[in-house]
Amino acid sequence: MKAILGKKVGMTQVFTEQGEVVPVTVLQSEGMVVVQKKTEEKDGYNAIQVGFGDVKIKNVVKPKKGHFDKSKVEPKRFLREFRVDNIEEYEVGQKLGVDIFQVGEKVDVSGISKGKGFQGNVKRHGHSRGGMSHGSKFHRRRGSLGASAGVGKVVKGTKNHGHMGNEKVTVLNLEVVRVDADKNVILLKGAVPGPKKGLIKIREAVRKNK
C-alpha cells in the first residue's frame, strides 16, 4: 500500500482548465525517510518504518536516538509504520516523497481533528434546541434520554454533552489535484482534518470504486 506522512499547510483554491474553482488543501511531505524494513521471514509481515519531521537532538530520548543511530539515519520527530506489498522496493535511508501519487488518483487522509473542549449536545451532536423566549426553560439543554421507567438509568453510549474533537478522523476518496515533486507538495480536493502544521497520513484509497 502506498502511503506518506505530511504536514498540513492550509487551504486555498485552484482553477481547472474549464475555469471551475476547486477548493484544495495543501500538504507538504518533506524529509520522510525509511528507518527500518520488516520482512515476512523475520517479523511475520512486510512493512517499512518511516521517520518524518525535524527535531532537535536534545529532545530525542536515548532509546529512540539509538534506534535511528542503528539505521544511520538522522532522528525524526515522528515514527510510523506502513504495510507494503513488495519490500524489495525500499531501502533503509531511502527518501520518500509525494511523487508516489498521480494527479486524479483517489487517496484516504487521516489526521487528529481540532480539539473543541467540553461542548453541549447542540454543538457536539447537532441536536435541535428549544425555544429561546416566551417562558421557555429548555433553550440548549438536552431532551429526553429515552430511559423511561423500565431502565431507570442512562444507557451507555447515549449521545450527551462531553469532550469534542481531538480524535483521529479519516476522510475517504479525496482526489489528488496537483503534485509538485520539487517542493514535495501535494494538493487534495476538499478539506482535511486537523489544524495547520498537524501531522497527516495520506494513503491510496481502499474503496476506489465506491
Task: Report residues per predicted region.
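Extended basic (Lys/Arg/His-rich) segments that typically form rRNA-contacting surfaces
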Residues: 1-210
